[in-house]
Amino acid sequence: MKKWTRRAFIGAGVLAGGTLVLGIAIRPGNRASKVAGLIASSGETVMNIWLKIALDNTITAIIPHAEMGQGVHTALAMMLADEMDADWSKVKFEEAPAAKEYANYSVAKGFIAGNAHFPKFLDETINGIFLTAVKSLNFQITGGSASVRFTGQDAMRIAGAAAKAMLLQAASDTWKVPVEELVAEKSVVKHASSGQSATFGELIPAAAEVKTPSHPKLKSQAEFTLMGTSQPRLDIPAKVTGEAKFGMDVQVPGMKYATIKAAPVFGSKVKSVDTNVTSSQPGVLKIVNLGEAVAVIAEGYWQAKTALNMLPITF
């Protein structure tokens, strides 16, 4: 066990002092069953909240961060896949749903506890404390360079390593061979002496019954096969073809559009606005004087934008 830092010791005392009595009840554990209905389709098994495996051997990384040009969809998938020894050509990603189970305690823990190292016997309890807190806040954010250093290191890598351990154990139980004799390579588990092998997808039914390890062994830097390499970004093809969904593509029943013209100088107010000019324009529903800005609400964006441009506004 690593040497306790003063920060870790104080943090453990504060956090555990009031909640350790709850014990296992507040530990996050494997929440796969709680998100299966949100992310799994037919033929897919949710190994943990960060990944699912299909019978056709496709691995899907569930990414809880927004893509803003930083390549996080690919980077986090690489970290997960590397720990699994997965075939990168069979890895894809999906964005995590806006659900409480995806409130990211790894990010909260990273910002608050920093690099503090807690003893293993407290680790799961502390994770549970942070999970309880972030779920109450619906804490699912992107920022602060947190995606790789917190979610990647403390969620994706652990999720990948845990899934690999479960797959190896499933093969060991099925073939009646020591788990130490098994290796995983490119989404296939192999037993050299007997010549037996099976894809991750083939092992999924058995692996789903294996208990999830809370502290799976992570690779050393020398063992990385994907991390630290340059790989084609997973999000680019859909952006090129136009299939990718952006925030502005989202539509909900009864949705309307608004465009706003704000005062050109900080502190100035709307002096006058002639609503008669555009109120009869097709699709225009309402013109709102916000005091420091004017908004036009319409059935469509272009209708709102066109009407706003026609409005005579004096600030």
Question: How would you name each of these model-derived features?
Answer:
Residues 1-315:
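Cofactor-binding beta-sheet edge motifs in enzyme active sites
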